[in-house]
Every structure is written in structure tokens, then in C-alpha cells.
């Protein structure tokens, strides 16, 4: 099974397993580390936050299904955890949910802030999302508008 198919099927299984528990997939990594592949799953709960027991339950059920379906093309290690305090932002609903939070965005290409300075990294308060563009009040006092299709990576930043 191709890598994209593995990711798609694991995503489907997590949705099936997580839904009754109120658990959603935040991010999924499937990549080579050393000689083995790693399936790294990051989960969250909309209500009350995810805990170790939740992660263990999803891990157990996911592992059982992966064993039964036996579609993984090679040996792998399964890791299931919360996304942590620097949670990635992947979907529009993530940006909507974390409005007003400090974020860091890295783009595929250089983009201008409101002063015309070009950069690939934007750090500041998320102020909005509309029409596929996120607004950020930068820590330097400027404002930036970043199209979602230009975002390579985005995540929450820890605020001291």
C-alpha cells in the first residue's frame, strides 16, 4: 500500500475509533526513522482535554485494527499522544478555534507584512480568518495577512 493510502486508511480508522470517545485527529505523521516506519498520531478532545487513558485506548484499538487489516507495507512503531502546547494548526476550524492565541506560521515563499518587509516566518496573535487568509498581529507591531495555501507549517506558540 502506498504511503498516501496508509495515511488515508489510518485517518479513517482514527475517526471511527475516536468519534465515540469524543476524540479527534489533530495530525498524523507516517515516516521513516532509522530502519523502521513510525506512525505518529496526535489527538485532542473538544471537551475537557485529552489524557493518557484516552491516548492509550485509541492506541489499543488502532493497533488491534492495524493488526487485523494487516495493510502496513513494513514494520512500524505506533505512537499516540496529545499535540502538546505547541499544537499544530492544520484546518480552518483550528484557526477559528484559536483566535486570539499566539501562533507561528512558516510559509513556502517570502511574503510581505503590512510594512512591505518580506519574510517566511510570522509570529503574533491570530486575529482572524476569512476567504482563505489568516490575519496576524505580529509581535513587532505590524500586521500580516497570510493566504492558507502559502502556509507550510503553523502552530500555537507557548506564551510566558
UniProtKB/Swiss-Prot annotation:
Q: Does the keyword Cytoplasm apply?
A: yes
Q: Which GO terms describe its cellular component?
A: cytosol
State the compartments where it is located.
Cytoplasm
Q: Which family does it belong to?
A: Belongs to the RimP family.
Q: Does the keyword section mention Amino-acid biosynthesis?
A: no
This chain is encoded by the gene named: rimP
What is the phylogenetic placement of the source species in the record? Bacteria, Pseudomonadati, Thermodesulfobacteriota, Desulfuromonadia, Geobacterales
Q: Which UniProt keywords apply?
A: Cytoplasm, Ribosome biogenesis
The protein here is known as: Ribosome maturation factor RimP
Described function: Required for maturation of 30S ribosomal subunits.
Task: Return the Pfam families for the record.
Answer: DUF150_C, RimP_N
The biological processes this protein is annotated with in GO are: ribosomal small subunit assembly; translation
Q: Which organism is it from?
A: Geobacter sp. (strain M21)
What NCBIfam families does its record include?
PRK14647.1
Amino acid at each position: 500500500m502506498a504511503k498516501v493510502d496508509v495515511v488515508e486508511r489510518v485517518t479513517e480508522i482514527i475517526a471511527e475509533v475516536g468519534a465515540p470517545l469524543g476524540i479527534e485527529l489533530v495530525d498524523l505523521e507516517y515516516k521513516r526513522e532509522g530502519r523502521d516506519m513510525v506512525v505518529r498520531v496526535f489527538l485532542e478532545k473538544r471537551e475537557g482535554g485529552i489524557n493518557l487513558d484516552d491516548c492509550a485506548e485509541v492506541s489499543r484499538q488502532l493497533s488491534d485494527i492495524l493488526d487485523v487489516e494487516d495493510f502496513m507495507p513494513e514494520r512500524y512503531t505506533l505512537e499516540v499522544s496529545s499535540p502538546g502546547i505547541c499544537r499544530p494548526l492544520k484546518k480552518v476550524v483550528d484557526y477559528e478555534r484559536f483566535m486570539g492565541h499566539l501562533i507561528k506560521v512558516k510559509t513556502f515563499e517570502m511574503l510581505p507584512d503590512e510594512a512591505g518587509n518580506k519574510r517566511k516566518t510570522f509570529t503574533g496573535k491570530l486575529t482572524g480568518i476569512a476567504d482563505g487568509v489568516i490575519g496576524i498581529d505580529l509581535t513587532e507591531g505590524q500586521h500580516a495577512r497570510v493566504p492558507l495555501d502559502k502556509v507550510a507549517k503553523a502552530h500555537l506558540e507557548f506564551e510566558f
